Amino acid sequence: MTVFVFAFYLFAVVAVVAGLMVVLSKNPVHAVLWLILTFLSAAGLFVLMGAEFVAMLLIIVYVGAVAVLFLFVVMMLDIDFAALRGQLVRYAPVGGLIALVMLAQLATGLMVWNTADAANGLRAAPAPEGVENTAALGMILYDRYLYLFQGAGLVLLVAMIGAILLTLRHRTDIKRQNVLAQMHRDPAKALEMVDVKPGQGL
């Protein structure tokens, strides 16, 4: 058994076991940790297949952002998971049926999957010999699709700014300090001498 085959079986077994533990874990924090291990194992499989860019995306996006967000949400929110677990019994038959349908679809797809011999020659941009996957993808994005790539970045930037503007609300019922008005006020008018008579208020 070569090192490649051993690493493949190791990552595959760890990914399957960790995925099962995500579903079977009673503690939600443990489930998120098992989910992180599943993503890391899947990233290892992508590296073995030569898709190191996809592996880096999987680690940065899913492990570094989504899974950590899940972990913080689970740890910070006071959720009664015991009550939620009791309600899952009602939806178990429907969930099992959906799982069987999805499993049948995956099995059908694997049985009829067939790759043509001329598929590699029909690629839009085949990778040159001796060039890594990440380098080839970078050359395509920043050479052939440079303007489209920059346009996609601008669309994401506009979407981010729009989300900030939608959530930014200026409340009028809160007293705020107007620093600009204070800086431009006349010092002679800032103080006012008031002669208060005994027994009277302002």
UniProtKB/Swiss-Prot annotation:
Recorded topology in the membrane: Multi-pass membrane protein
Keyword Nucleus: no
One GO CC annotation: plasma membrane-derived chromatophore membrane
UniProt subcellular location: Cellular chromatophore membrane
GO terms assigned for molecular function: NADH dehydrogenase (ubiquinone) activity; quinone binding
Assigned keywords, A-Z: Membrane, NAD, Quinone, Translocase, Transmembrane, Transmembrane helix, Ubiquinone
Catalytic activity: a quinone + NADH + 5 H(+)(in) = a quinol + NAD(+) + 4 H(+)(out)
Pfam family, one: Oxidored_q3
EC number(s) reported in the record: 7.1.1.-
TM region(s), chain numbering: 3-23, 31-51, 53-73, 93-113, 146-166
Phenotype reported upon loss of the gene: No functional NADH-quinone oxidoreductase complex. Cells lacking this gene have a nearly normal respiratory growth phenotype on lactate, however they are unable to perform anaerobic photosynthesis. It is suggested that in R.capsulatus this complex may function in reverse flow under physiological conditions.
Statement: the UniProt record of this protein carries the keyword Membrane: yes
Subunit structure: NDH-1 is composed of 14 different subunits. Subunits NuoA, H, J, K, L, M, N constitute the membrane sector of the complex.
Protein task: NDH-1 shuttles electrons from NADH, via FMN and iron-sulfur (Fe-S) centers, to quinones in the respiratory chain. The immediate electron acceptor for the enzyme in this species is believed to be ubiquinone. Couples the redox reaction to proton translocation (for every two electrons transferred, four hydrogen ions are translocated across the cytoplasmic membrane), and thus conserves the redox energy in a proton gradient.
Record-stated family: Belongs to the complex I subunit 6 family.
Protein name as it appears in the record: NADH-quinone oxidoreductase subunit J
Organism ancestry: Bacteria, Pseudomonadati, Pseudomonadota, Alphaproteobacteria, Rhodobacterales
